[in-house]
Amino acid sequence: MSFYSISDFIRENYPEYWGMQSYPANQCVRIHKIDEEWGIFSNFGHTPIVVEGVTFDTSERLFQLMKFKDEEPVKAIYYKKGNPKMTTKHWEKTHRREDWGEIIIDAMKFCLTQKYEQSEAFRQELERSKGKIIVEDQSGFTKKNPDAWGVKLQDDNFVGPNLLGRLLMELRDTGKLEYDLPDDAFTFLRYLK
């Protein structure tokens, strides 16, 4: 298993979200780029989130920071402009939470819930997507298969785990996501206040 792969985490800790899905492409709204239609669904979309008085420019930055408890990586990721995922990779091998695999989906559910509660535009777009399947389209990625969050187009279907799309549809259809995070899930915030 690659240190950065989350597939084993999902299979072991979140079996209800494990496995490949297939969706007819003509029934899907696709998350592809933040400046395209449905781009607000991307975790990289600029929908600021405030948690305990700390503002995050994107839900992706908040999610990436939840991987850490130590001051140095937290400050580096928070203050570095651009893609927080790339900055995070630098710190993960030496500083990632030991229990990250056990909380990864709950952390994403928290981030999406905050985005839902704090962004009217996000809620409106979720409502507008009713009746459609939401997918994170990774067809343009160079690797053969999509990662756990997305799908790739194969003939007339989007195929892949589609975790992000599935969580967004669950949030859209129920108005909430249930999550369970450890007491120390937000210790990183103390370095940002």
Predicted feature descriptions by range:
Residues 2-193:
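Charged, low-complexity intrinsically disordered segments
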